[in-house]
């Protein structure tokens, strides 16, 4: 039954990031064209089967009101939260179901319109609040942030400052790194839904982004611990920019290898741990410690891991590694600061990878387009892309949930 119910819904996702810029939860978008035919109990059972209850929360943002009503009537499931839109609380029947769900221990997250705070009545049952700022509130938050930074630089107290950002809440739609830093670092917000990727990268328009220092160090430590080739390969894949530079290094004339290296596995086997460690140590002095880049890297890796899962049933290990490279390099231009075509052509990648990234053609293109659609925030787009590529919704949903669950552990 869990397999059939996952075939009847469309799922999308938005990562939730904490003050350390690590994944602390996932907002799962749930939609269906036929809400009356989706059994809420079976849907929760299917999600629970694929989501480890001891990991980060899975926040269900359910579009059809009928399905949301049905989910409110179900017993709580470990690790699963339910988003409650404030406008629906005006319905007395719905509000009554919310109160009853609270009595049963269901964690619920109130969500309002920009600038809105939960009412006293909502405060009685909400587990968290998902808020957003109006333009005026965003400006006020930036002013407060500026005064806080000025006071810190001068070693003085900033005085009484009122920020519109509430401690312990989730926030969505924060459009700049300054707002994110104010919310997470200064005001102790619980988490941020989504990430201001374009604005973070804009700060690097005149300087080169470097691989993450903590991920380079983790690779060095893995080598020192004599971890397996598979583990080293997986860790390398957690850093898209480092993976790209490693393949450039493995194919450099100075290294003198006798053949093209078109995969991380080939490169690791050809170079060996000793030379790899030396090369990694050369990266460390220039490595980045900017935590605001971490969600950007992690999102790119999530796309690649989802593609791996989508391909899992149909390809052998070597081809699955190609699929991963296709995903991880599909946005590498954002980190390199150069056109995607030029970046891809610098590497001797298999034609299937290059054609999917640059031409949206070939056998890997459907997986890439579906993985990109899943992060779009639009269930309509997801449904249309899956239909265009004749990819069964149940298969896509299971790949998504398994990838998110593995990332949340």
Question: Where are these predicted regions, by residue range?
Answer:
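The catalytic core of metal-dependent phosphodiesterases that act on cyclic dinucleotides
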Residues: 74-198, 319-322
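Conserved alpha-helical "signature site"
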Residues: 146-409
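Short, structured coil/loop segments at alpha-helix boundaries
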Residues: 34-36, 64, 80, 88-94, ...
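Bacterial c-di-GMP phosphodiesterase EAL domain
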Residues: 2-81, 86-96, 272, 295, ...
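Generic alpha-helical propensity signal that fires on short helical segments
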Residues: 4, 27-29, 34-35, 41, ...
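Residues in intrinsically disordered, low-complexity segments of regulatory proteins
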Residues: 16-19, 50, 124, 200, ...
């Amino acid at each position: 039954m869990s397999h059939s119910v996952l075939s009847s819904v469309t799922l999308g996702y938005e990562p939730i990031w904490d003050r350390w810029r690590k994944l602390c939860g996932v907002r799962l978008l749930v939609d269906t064209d036929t809400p009356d035919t989706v059994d809420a109990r079976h849907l929760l059972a299917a999600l629970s089967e694929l989501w480890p209850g001891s990991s980060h929360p899975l926040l269900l943002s359910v579009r059809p009101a009928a399905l949301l009503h049905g989910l409110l009537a179900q017993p709580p499931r470990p690790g699963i939260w339910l988003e409650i839109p404030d406008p629906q609380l005006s319905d007395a029947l719905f509000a009554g179901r919310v109160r009853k769900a609270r009595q049963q221990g269901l964690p619920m997250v109130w969500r309002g319109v920009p600038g809105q705070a939960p009412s006293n009545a909502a405060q009685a049952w909400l587990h968290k609040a998902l808020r957003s700022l109006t333009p005026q509130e965003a400006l006020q938050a930036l002013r407060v942030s500026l005064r806080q930074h000025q006071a810190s630089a001068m070693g003085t107290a900033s005085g009484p400052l009122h920020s519109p950002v509430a401690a312990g809440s989730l926030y969505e739609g924060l459009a700049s790194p300054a707002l994110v830093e104010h919310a997470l670092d200064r005001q102790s917000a619980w988490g941020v839904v989504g990430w201001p990727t374009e604005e973070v990268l804009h700060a690097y328009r005149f300087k080169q982004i470097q691989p993450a220092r903590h991920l380079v160090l983790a690779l060095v430590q893995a080598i020192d611990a004599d971890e397996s080739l598979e583990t080293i390969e997986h860790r390398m894949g957690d850093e898209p920019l480092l993976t790209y530079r490693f393949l450039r290094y493995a194919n450099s004339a100075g290294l003198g290898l006798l053949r093209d290296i078109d995969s991380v596995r080939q490169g690791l086997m050809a170079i060996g741990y000793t030379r790899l460690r030396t090369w990694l140590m050369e990266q460390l002095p220039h490595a980045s410690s900017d935590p605001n880049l971490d969600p950007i890297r992690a999102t790119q890796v999530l796309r690649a891991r989802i593609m791996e899962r989508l391909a899992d049933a149909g390809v052998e290990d070597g081809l699955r590694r190609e699929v991963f490279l296709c995903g991880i390099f599909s946005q590498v231009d954002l980190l390199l600061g150069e056109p995607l075509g030029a970046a891809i052509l610098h590497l001797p990648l298999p034609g299937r990878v290059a054609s999917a990234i640059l031409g949206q053609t070939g056998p890997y293109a459907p997986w890439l387009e579906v993985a990109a659609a899943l992060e779009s925030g639009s269930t309509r787009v997801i449904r249309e892309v899956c239909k265009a590529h004749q990819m069964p919704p149940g298969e896509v949903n299971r790949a998504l949930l398994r990838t998110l669950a593995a990332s949340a552990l």
